[in-house]
Design a protein with these regions (language model features):
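Hydrophobic core positions within HEAT/HEAT-like alpha-solenoid repeats
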Residues: 154, 186-187
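Short amphipathic alpha-helical surface patches that serve as generic macromolecular interface elements
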Residues: 166, 183-186
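Bacterial Sec-dependent N-terminal signal peptides
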Residues: 1-28
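Core of folded catalytic or high-affinity ligand/protein-binding domains
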Residues: 148-159, 163-165
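Extended repeat-based scaffolds of very large eukaryotic assembly and lipid-transport proteins
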Residues: 19-152, 191-241
């Protein structure tokens, strides 16, 4: 028993020491993390949808979803709001993510999660696919109004493989070049469509190679930015619709 307690104390000590060794991000880095993990909240039937979500409780499979009769009673725009602000599937990641130093100076290989320990169910992603044109139009409408692309919108764009929205996203990005995750969306679209010039590049190998992980990134600088924009524009022009 004493040996077990000693072992547990040693593990706890190592965990605390590991936490102490993490780099302490700057205020600018922390502010950017808040910026890039923020979801866009559509206004369509928002109070009604939020009231419905507030009454949900998870079932035995840790799924929090509206009963079919309630979901089917929603208009398309209300369903858009529901799906954009609520992930139905519980998918806890047991490994805590360490703080990221200089997050604002990186272009990441992957997007951050929109719903912490939850994610979209197959039914929810199917809604995006089945109503693709309407979903893209509503995303554009919302982004034009709010001047930002929430992480949930980015995830939906990648999920739908919405290549047709590339010119719009580029226009949004070029306004202030603040949201580097728009560049990540471009990378993910080129990857999903197996765009050969990108697959053959050194940046692809670094971002999505065997050693890549959730935090893999390249440095945000003018050269990398311009290369991504050039590649995604070439990809878009040659994309077979």
């Amino acid at each position: 028993m004493r040996m077990l307690m000693a072992g547990l104390l040693m593990m706890a000590s190592l965990f605390v020491n590991a936490q102490d060794e993490y780099p302490k991000p700057s205020k600018e880095s922390l502010d950017y993390n808040v910026y890039r993990t923020k979801v866009s909240v559509p206004p369509y039937g928002l109070a009604k949808v939020k009231a419905m979500i507030a009454k949900l409780t998870p079932n035995d499979e840790e799924i929090e979803k509206l009963p079919d009769n309630l979901y089917n009673s929603l208009s398309l725009r209300e369903k858009f709001t529901y799906n954009m602000i609520h992930g139905e599937i519980y998918s806890q990641n047991c490994d805590p993510m360490p703080p990221v130093e200089d997050e604002h100076k990186k272009i990441f290989a992957q997007l951050p999660g929109a719903f912490d320990e939850y994610s979209w169910s197959d039914k929810q992603t199917q809604f995006f696919d089945n109503n693709r044109d309407s979903v893209i139009a509503l995303i554009k409408e919302s982004v034009t109004r709010s001047k930002r692309v929430g992480v949930n919108y980015k995830e939906a764009i990648v999920s739908m493989n919405a290549v047709e929205i590339i010119p719009f996203l580029e226009e949004v990005y070029l306004r202030d070049k603040k949201d580097h995750d728009i560049l990540t969306v471009f990378l993910l679209l080129m990857k999903a469509n197996k765009y050969q010039p990108f697959l053959a590049s050194s940046s692809f190998k670094k971002l999505y190679g065997d050693d890549a992980n959730y935090g893999t990134h390249i440095v945000y600088n003018s050269a990398n930015e311009q290369l991504i924009l050039q590649r995604v524009n070439d990809f878009y022009k040659n994309y077979k619709r």
